Amino acid sequence: MSDIIDDFQKDVTINMQKCIDNFKININKIHVGRISPDILSFIKIEYYGVITPLCQLTNTVVEQPRTLIITVFDSSMIKFIEKAILESNLGCTPVSTGNTIRVTFPTLTESRRYSLIKMVRSESEKSKVLIRNIRRVSNDKLKTFLRNKEINKDNEHYFQNEIQNLTDIWIKKIILITKEKELELMKF
């Protein structure tokens, strides 16, 4: 029984950690005053039938605080890369010249900052819902364990409390990360 429960607890923790990791990745796409090539790291392009990360098809450097220069290795991919950047909802403008693409990001106005904060809060809520869904699925598994007599009623109650504690901890982390990102957005 203890092996089942140990594996179960590890799975719950791992799933909640993955949720937090994805949340961090998603809000790191939301840029503040400084731009880095990492802001494009999630963009993928179909290259000869294979979905390929942008970083494998290009070399990206920072030209100015709001401008990236992307050197494309295969010039036939320029239009596809421009399209992928435009569709990424980063609010930037790609302009190609030769085998390079210049990507300019807008300055952060107050209204743009507030819209970015709304995006961060939206991602935060999505992540909280995912954490709660993990809790719900986990509690359902506990009920199945109880029905199959793999655990008793006391163990079920104990592990439900443990799962609730984990849920509270991970949601607090999401709230903390959200507040940090909001402060970062308002600072620049």
Curated annotation (Swiss-Prot):
InterPro entries reported for this sequence: Ribosome_recyc_fac (IPR002661), Ribosome_recyc_fac_dom (IPR023584), RRF_sf (IPR036191)
UniProt keyword annotation of Transmembrane present: no
GO cellular component: cytosol
Record keywords, A-Z: Cytoplasm, Protein biosynthesis
Coarse class of the protein's main subcellular location: cytoplasm
UniProt record, GO biological process: cytoplasmic translational termination
Molecular functions (GO terms): ribosomal large subunit binding
Gene3D superfamilies per the UniProt record, alphabetical: 3.30.1360.40, Ribosome-recycling factor
Compartment annotation: Cytoplasm
Family statement: Belongs to the RRF family.
HAMAP family for the chain: RRF
UniProt function note: Responsible for the release of ribosomes from messenger RNA at the termination of protein biosynthesis. May increase the efficiency of translation by recycling ribosomes from one round of translation to another.
UniProt protein name: Ribosome-recycling factor
Species assigned in the record: Blochmanniella floridana
Higher taxonomy: Bacteria, Pseudomonadati, Pseudomonadota, Gammaproteobacteria, Enterobacterales
